[in-house]
Amino acid sequence: IRCFITPDVTSQACPDGHVCYTKMWCDNFCGMRGKRVDLGCAATCPKVKPGVNIKCCSRDNCNPFPTRKRS
């Protein structure tokens, strides 16, 4: 499987059986910059703390950097 990986947001090969993930959360600059985003791959979908959103998927490049909605 190939997943996008931060910080460069490049597509990289991950080991067989791994999943891609997109993890998003707010920090002190959330109001100005939007949510922080971490892209990667892992053996299983990572467990996250409350307030952190995570989406896992198992297709090539299924975790692109999310686009920010314009108001």
Swiss-Prot record:
CDD domains: TFP_snake_toxin (cd00206). It is found in: Secreted. Keywords: Acetylcholine receptor inhibiting toxin, Disulfide bond, Ion channel impairing toxin, Neurotoxin, Postsynaptic neurotoxin, Secreted, Toxin. Transmembrane segments: none annotated. InterPro entries: Snake_3FTx (IPR003571), Snake_toxin-like_sf (IPR045860), Snake_toxin_con_site (IPR018354), Toxin_cobra-type (IPR054131). The keyword Metal-binding does not apply. Pfam families: Toxin_cobra-type. One of its GO terms (cellular component) is extracellular region. The keyword Disulfide bond applies. Expressed by the venom gland. Its main location: secreted. One of its GO terms (molecular function) is ion channel regulator activity. Belongs to the three-finger toxin family. Long-chain subfamily. Type II alpha-neurotoxin sub-subfamily. Binds with high affinity to muscular (alpha-1/CHRNA1) and neuronal (alpha-7/CHRNA7) nicotinic acetylcholine receptor (nAChR) and inhibits acetylcholine from binding to the receptor, thereby impairing neuromuscular and neuronal transmission. This is Long neurotoxin 1. It comes from Naja nivea (Cape cobra). The lineage of its organism: Eukaryota, Metazoa, Chordata, Craniata, Vertebrata.
